[in-house]
Amino acid sequence: MNNILNRIYNGYNLTEIESYNLFQYIMSGKINNVQLSAILIALKIKGESEQEIMGAMQACLEQAQPFPKQNYMFSDIVGTGGDLSNSINISTASALVGATCGLKIIKHCNSSISGKSGSYDLLKEFDININISQKKSQEMLNKLNVCFLFAPQYHASFKHVSLVRKILKTRTLFNILGPLLNPSNPPLSVIGVYSTKLMIPIAHILKKLNRHRSIIVYSNNIDEVTLHSPTNITELKNSKITSYTLYPESFGVHFHDKNTILGGTPKENYEIVKKVFQGKGPISITETIAANTAILLQLFGNEDLKKNTQYALKIIYSGKVYQKIIELSKF
């Protein structure tokens, strides 16, 4: 173990097996908090390699509680966070719209670590309880097309790293791992990342996991599709990886200034998202959520992004998403 630690401290990449062994130690609580802080910051400064991400992911998944296998296509839509953008919870909002469109969504959720508002924090403001049993989550999925898997419930070993992550208050390898650790092993996924450097490595990892189709997104330091800048896309489809760029006009919507999608605390984000789903929200945020939902719809074979966006907008303005939120809060 000392040899592995010295390699990290000296700026060398670990092999997949070295990373796996290291994170087995970490997730078993065998590394003290001072060492863990040094490891995470050293990896961050060096830049986490594909092999390091893969090894760490395998170690974390081995200790996770799996979610029952589904016999149909379903998706996650999730971001690494850590992009420092303070945008509203776009992925969570888009998951709710997608489910209202009839898609099956199993979203991996957590409270905020390196930002102001995580998916759990927003859902809590809507009185949606996601800290529920597997059976209850499955019932929610069956009845309402969506369920939310609360990360601490399925990844108990993360208790060994939570304090350090909160103290560091910066993105680390665990931000990268989050979207890869959904206990349901979704065949489809939209994954937002905070850096273009992560796009190809994550696509390679998803390919090794035999994912059916995945779309990885990045836009001007934000881990979502945005309408103020081009959005970089890396797509895994039929075991082939391609990269391309999308623009606001790709979705048939308007350009919007970055400052118009800013959020804040969970309470502030709740007020914004509530207005959107009541049909009274800012057009910039409404169209941004619709564009992200369009990507989600594309995963399920609906290839026309402009039609997808218009359909998502229709669903939002119908009030059906807000009605689904009310149903979820009663579950």
Curated annotation (Swiss-Prot):
Residue numbers binding Mg(2+) 1: 91, 224
GO CC, any one term: cytosol
Names of required cofactors: Mg(2+)
The EC number(s) this enzyme carries: 2.4.2.18
Swiss-Prot/TrEMBL catalytic activity: N-(5-phospho-beta-D-ribosyl)anthranilate + diphosphate = 5-phospho-alpha-D-ribose 1-diphosphate + anthranilate
UniProt enzyme class: transferase
One Pfam family here: Glycos_trans_3N
Keywords: Amino-acid biosynthesis, Aromatic amino acid biosynthesis, Glycosyltransferase, Magnesium, Metal-binding, Transferase, Tryptophan biosynthesis
Family annotation (HAMAP family): TrpD
Name this polypeptide is given: Anthranilate phosphoribosyltransferase
Source species of the chain: Buchnera aphidicola subsp. Melaphis rhois
